[in-house]
A protein has these predicted regions:
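Conserved catalytic-core segment of clan PA serine endopeptidases
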Residues: 2-8, 19-23, 28, 55-122, ...
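Short, hydrophobic/aromatic-rich segments at coil-to-beta transitions
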Residues: 7-15, 183-185
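Conserved beta-strand and immediately adjacent loop positions that scaffold enzyme active sites
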Residues: 12, 30, 111, 140, ...
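Residues within well-ordered beta-strands of beta-sheet-rich folds
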Residues: 14, 38-40, 80, 114-116, ...
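Acidic glycine-/aspartate-rich tracts in secreted/extracellular proteins
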Residues: 19-20, 44-48, 83-86, 118-122, ...
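Short beta-strand segments
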Residues: 27-29, 89-95, 125, 156-162, ...
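C-terminal subregion of chymotrypsin/trypsin-like serine protease catalytic domains
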Residues: 27-28, 33-47, 53-78, 160-166, ...
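Chymotrypsin/trypsin-fold serine protease catalytic domain
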Residues: 85, 108-188, 222-239
Length: 265
């Protein structure tokens, strides 16, 4: 792995969430640091599910009712750094203080969330988001997450180079079975349990173009669905403002010098 890729991947973080309120019951997901105190992830990683698998149509509507109940307590959402994370053993480097996501209780076309953290994270990359242009079929992306890749060792960060965007919603792929809403796209290379919320990075620029939402078996190609980040540019702007506010409050309370924030999109 090149030094540039190592730095880029350091910005992909593990997220441990106690969805049932019991700190000993932690669900592992992935996310991306998009400001020193702001993480991008999937909403199903930080909200309690009431259905096992969303059933969606190409308009982004649910065919099996509401998917989510309330949000997890932000203080029970931890962010972990490093290439190998074991949430039952390791200590989080930060906790969430606020969760931002689309309204409603449906994951279809809306499985994205931002976490404002209680402290800035240093020594890792802050990854840019591509908010001004959608992803296109045929593009190459680099999925990164803590599903372990081909070894399927959950908690090990892995990437899949040159994954191809097979389709962009609204569409239904008869070959793979993927049904995509207007804000979703499908890649060919498998994502695994633990990769949820992890980013797909533009192979050329390193910008985040989507986050893992749902998918088929880890061992098969196709039907791996991402939510586009450009479709939620306004939510991203709100999240950056909340992160900046938290930084100012932290500075005022502790009289510390803040880490530089990336420019708001």
């Amino acid at each position: 792995m090149t030094e540039a890729l190592e730095l880029e991947e350091s910005g992909v973080v593990a997220i441990g969430t106690s969805l049932d309120g019991d700190p000993s019951h932690i669900t592992l997901c992935s996310g991306a640091l998009v400001a020193p105190n702001l993480v991008l992830t999937a909403r199903h990683c930080v909200s309690r599910s009431i259905t096992s698998t969303p059933s969606c149509d190409a308009r982004g509507r649910s065919h099996n009712g509401a998917h989510l109940a309330d949000d997890a307590d932000p203080s029970l959402i931890g962010v972990y750094l490093g290439a190998q994370v074991r949430v039952e053993r390791d200590l989080p480097r930060a906790h969430a203080i606020k969760t931002l996501h689309p309204t409603g209780q449906i994951l279809c076309d809306a499985d994205v969330a931002f976490l404002v953290l209680d402290r800035p994270l240093s020594g890792v990359a802050v990854l840019p988001m591509r908010l001004n242009a959608p992803v296109s079929s045929g593009e190459w992306v680099r999925p990164v997450g803590f599903g372990g890749g081909v070894s399927n060792t959950i908690g090990n960060r892995a990437r899949r180079d040159r994954s191809t965007v097979l389709a962009v919603g609204p569409s239904a792929n008869v070959d793979t079975g993927a049904v995509l809403g207007p804000r979703e796209f499908e890649v060919d290379r498998a994502t695994c349990r633990g990769d949820s919320g992890g980013p797909a990075l533009d192979m050329q620029t390193g910008e985040i173009v989507g986050v893992v939402s749902r998918g088929g078996s880890c061992s098969v190609e196709g039907n791996h669905v991402y939510t586009r980040v450009d479709a939620y540019a306004r939510l991203a702007q709100m999240a950056f403002r909340e992160a900046e506010r938290a930084t100012r409050e932290n500075v005022a309370a502790n009289n510390v010098v803040p880490l530089a924030m990336p420019p708001a999109p």
